[in-house]
Structures are given as C-alpha cells and as structure tokens.
C-alpha cells in the first residue's frame, strides 16, 4: 500500500476494481494493489511484482512497513506492506484480464484489473475499501502516530 503525508494527514493509493461487475460500485470496490502468489515465492517479492502488474509502474523503494494479513469474505488471505512514496494516478497503465461478457454470450472481452487509482484520505478510504482491508488502514494509522 503506497501512502503519503500531505499536510498533517495520511493518504493511501487505492485502486478501483475493473470490469463490468464493479463498474457502478463504489463502496467495497476499492483495494490495495494485490494478487496471488505461489508458496515458493516470498510474499514481499509477490507484492512488488503485483504492484507492477496491476499499475504498470515500478514499485517504489523505501522502508516496507508490515501491515500483516487479513482474510477477505471470499476466503482469500491478503498480506500487505506500506511504503511511503508518491505517484501520479494518471501515469498508471493497468494490467488486464479476460472474461466472457455479457454472460453466456460466447464473447470474450478484456478489462483492466484496476480501472482507476486515487489518493484517498484514511476516512474516505475506510468508506470504500474492501471491508477486510480496512484493518490495513488502521494498522498504518497506528504505525504513523
């Protein structure tokens, strides 16, 4: 999770999940850049790789603050770190995925994994982030005190 300190607060960079299932959703549709990895890949290495795959930008260098793990409603376990840095959301070139759309149409369409990213203050981020991932925001806030 990329974060910055404008003024006296904290902002985090979150991505809005792409594809037609998320197009009209806001609450619960924002996430830290993330992805799956195999047991033989270190989680930190996977986190950096997924940042690049999802945003199309090199992951920032800097001190990695471990934020631990959360279990999402779908059962997936997400491990996250926070790194202080800055980037222009307009600079992202998101990775894509393919799915049949519309359903049962036989047509395969490509969609961005993340359709946009934004810097959000912690209060706004808590309103829209995937519910389980809100714990990462709390842990970052605690670390930053």
Regions found by a protein language model. Give the residues of each.
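N-terminal strand-loop-strand
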Residues: 1-31, 81
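Short, charged/polar surface micro-motifs in flexible loops or helix N-caps
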Residues: 6-9, 19-22, 38-39, 74-75, ...
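Residues that scaffold the ATP/ADP-binding catalytic core of kinase and kinase-like folds
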Residues: 24, 40, 128
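Short connector loops at helix/strand junctions that flank enzyme active sites
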Residues: 27, 32, 61, 74-78, ...
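The catalytic Nudix box helix
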Residues: 32-67, 121
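Active-site-adjacent beta-strand/loop module that shapes the phosphate/pyrophosphate-binding cleft
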Residues: 69-106, 118, 140
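Alpha-helix-centered segments that form part of catalytic cores
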Residues: 107-123
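Charged phosphate-binding loop/patch that engages nucleotide di/tri-phosphates or the phosphate backbone
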Residues: 118, 122-145
């Amino acid at each position: 999770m990329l974060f910055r300190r404008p003024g006296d607060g904290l902002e985090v960079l979150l991505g809005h999940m792409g594809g037609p299932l998320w197009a009209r959703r806001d609450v619960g549709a924002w996430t830290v850049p993330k992805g799956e990895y195999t047991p033989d890949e270190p989680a930190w290495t996977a986190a950096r790789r997924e940042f690049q795959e999802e945003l199309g930008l090199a992951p920032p260098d800097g001190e990695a603050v471990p934020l631990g793990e959360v279990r999402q409603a779908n059962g997936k376990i997400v491990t996250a770190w926070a790194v202080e840095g800055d980037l222009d959301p307009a600079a992202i070139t998101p990775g894509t995925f393919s799915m049949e759309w519309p359903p049962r149409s036989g047509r395969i369409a490509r969609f961005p994994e993340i359709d946009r990213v934004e810097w959000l203050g912690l209060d706004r981020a808590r309103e829209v982030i995937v519910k389980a991932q809100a714990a990462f925001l709390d842990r970052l806030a605690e670390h930053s005190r």
